[in-house]
Amino acid sequence: MNEQRFFRFLRERIGLDVESVGAPMVERALRQRCVAAGAMDLDDYWLRLQQSADEQQALIEAVIVPETWFFRYPESFTALASLAHKRLAQLAGARPLRLLSLPCSTGEEPYSLAMALFDAGMAPGAFLVDGMDISPSSVAKAGQAVYGRNAFRGSELGFRERYFDALDEGHRLHERVRQQVSLRVGNVLDPALASRDGLYDFVFCRNLLIYFDVPTQQRVFEVLKRLLHPQGVLFIGPAEGSLLARMGMRPLGIAQSFAYVRHEGDSAPLAAAPAQTAKRAFTTLPAPVYPQPSVPLPRSRRVLPVAARPARAREHSHEGASELLAGIARLANAGASEQARSECQRYLSQYPPSAQVYYWLGLLSDTEGDAQQALSHYRKALYLEPQHPEALVHLAALLAAQGDLAGARRLQERAARAGRESER
């Protein structure tokens, strides 16, 4: 096919496995750039691409569509706060903590790292955050640090009041947070990256490996390993754990944190704090209360229709369901996976099916490495609530990790549409 040379170019330059995002999406980007560059056809555009570094970058920008928000996977930031205090004590003032967000996209993740550590009581001189991305436009937007509604998701948005000023065009991040983060353009496939940047105590590289083929995954992992201090912690995406397990890393053992350390016997990774005593960097996201779905229950769990109940009973039932959902979130965020799972089952036995409960069951199974159970639960969540944002994102990542790239792509497109609609 005429497009194959462009696919090879993207693989060589940024490691992209085109099938992971879908050939049609890349083909649309090619058509857009052909028009923008004034090329007569793909052959003409190929010649222009070879002769212009600016056009090469423009094509990469057209293909990359950032999807991120503040405090995505909040349990990772809770774990970071506890681990960072331990690591800082080990350093005993020798140097500040070093953290890396790669890719940093439009800045939500590296700024979340800084806010989490501030919330954990750390002074500005105690840590430094680096953010790197291959996209100059994303890095430029991160530098502006002005964000719209889509960057703030979930119901726990207290950090926005603490660290942002409201503007007509969105919310601007406080200078205090911005000064903690250094941003730059860079490529994770750059072989000089590790030697140039030294070692990091914490590296956040989430939902990147799943877009690469196996050889590129290995190359990227070797770079990450060189960047990471022997006692450091690598935070990844939910569906990438099996990849790291094959590459000599092991989970740290903090539920839903997706934190991994080296499996080598000569390293002494940070011990995970007991979940019940871990100091939180911020209040973790409670389970949102979603509208009750109008699907029939199995006969064994049939409940009295809401319309037939007295008003007081309906009110009491709603409050009980909300309290149970909040309790599930607290247990899961505290790492009490078995108790959280038990409470999910209790909810399903007492109340109508809930997309959020099935999402929690999926995430618990995902964290424990049970991919098939996770798939089943995520799909049930989406049956009940087709636009459930977290279920869409997690199921897409899981399908991509299993090689179902077409299915993952469809879910990614649904998630992107849902995100756009939420901004209207």
Swiss-Prot record:
Description of the deletion phenotype: Mutants show a dramatic reduction in biofilm formation.
Keywords: Methyltransferase, S-adenosyl-L-methionine, TPR repeat, Transferase
Pfam family name, one: CheR
Per-repeat ranges for TPR: 355-388
EC numbers, comma separated: 2.1.1.-
UniProt entry tagged with the keyword Methyltransferase: yes
Gene Ontology terms, MF aspect: S-adenosylmethionine-dependent methyltransferase activity
Matches recorded under CDD domains: AdoMet_MTases
Positions of S-adenosyl-L-methionine binding: 68, 72, 109, 133, 187-188, 206-207
GO biological process: methylation
Positions of the CheR-type methyltransferase domain: 1-263
Cited function: Involved in biofilm formation.
Quaternary structure and interacting proteins, as annotated: Monomer. The TPR repeat does not mediate self-association.
Record protein name field: Probable biofilm formation methyltransferase WspC
